Amino acid sequence: MARYLGPKLKLTRREGTDLFLKSGVRAIDSKCKLEAAPGQHGARKARLSEYGVQLREKQKVRRTYGVLEKQFRNYYKDAARLKGNTGENLLTLLETRLDNVVYRMGFGATRAEARQLVSHKSIMVNGRVVNIPSFKVSANDVISVREKSQKQARIKAALEVASQREKPTWVEVDAAKMEGAFKRLPERSDLSADINEQLIVELYSK
């Protein structure tokens, strides 16, 4: 599947918020002027229409999770079929992607790095190698780093970075064993308050 390979901070500046596309070793605002649009001079951002606000929110979430437009729309359709709040269902589906869970557990410093680990067959689910980043993780699944991959410096570095940030309550990780359990589906209160998923629902409902 195609992926955006351009400058990560350009996307961050376009959305005006930290998309967690970089490792988090340094504060994002020390590297990137979030209030300025991309470009050498960072032209002042125009006031957005209602549609523009909805579109920006969708782009922000889509880019945060590293999902392309067609796949993101499919996630929305799946979320709409489920019982409950469509917006919250959408976030839950995105959170159950294997690449995201690998990132949440700290095996990858970014979701892009976690996706690469999965694609390169460095990750196991319940003892079996899975190389599909979009693989849906279920409650109580055990995620581990393949033994032959455990010496990778980037995984050790990622775990060190993860130890410095707040740990998600819905995963349990044994950093020494490079193994973790996806204990439960995250609740809306567990996730970023900076996301307004209702704007995405309104966008796709038109």
Swiss-Prot record:
Q: Which InterPro entries match?
A: Ribosomal_uS4, Ribosomal_uS4_bac-type, Ribosomal_uS4_CS, Ribosomal_uS4_N, S4_RNA-bd, S4_RNA-bd_sf
Q: Can you quote a single GO CC term?
A: small ribosomal subunit
Q: Gene3D superfamilies of this UniProt entry?
A: Ribosomal Protein S4 Delta 41, Chain A, domain 1, RNA-binding S4 domain
Matching entries from Pfam families are given as: Ribosomal_S4, S4
Checking SUPFAM superfamilies in the record gives:
Alpha-L RNA-binding motif (SSF55174)
UniProt domain S4 RNA-binding: residue ranges: 96-156
Q: Does the UniProt entry include the keyword Nuclease?
A: no
Which named protein is this?
Small ribosomal subunit protein uS4
What UniProt keywords are attached to this protein's entry? Ribonucleoprotein, Ribosomal protein, RNA-binding, rRNA-binding
Q: Which family does it belong to?
A: Belongs to the universal ribosomal protein uS4 family.
Single Gene Ontology BP annotation: ribosomal small subunit biogenesis
* Gene that produces this protein: rpsD
Function, as annotated, reads: One of the primary rRNA binding proteins, it binds directly to 16S rRNA where it nucleates assembly of the body of the 30S subunit. With S5 and S12 plays an important role in translational accuracy.
Q: Which residues form a coiled coil?
A: none
Organism this protein belongs to: Shewanella loihica (strain ATCC BAA-1088 / PV-4)
Give the quaternary structure: Part of the 30S ribosomal subunit. Contacts protein S5. The interaction surface between S4 and S5 is involved in control of translational fidelity.
Transmembrane spans? none
In the UniProt record, the signal sequence range is: none
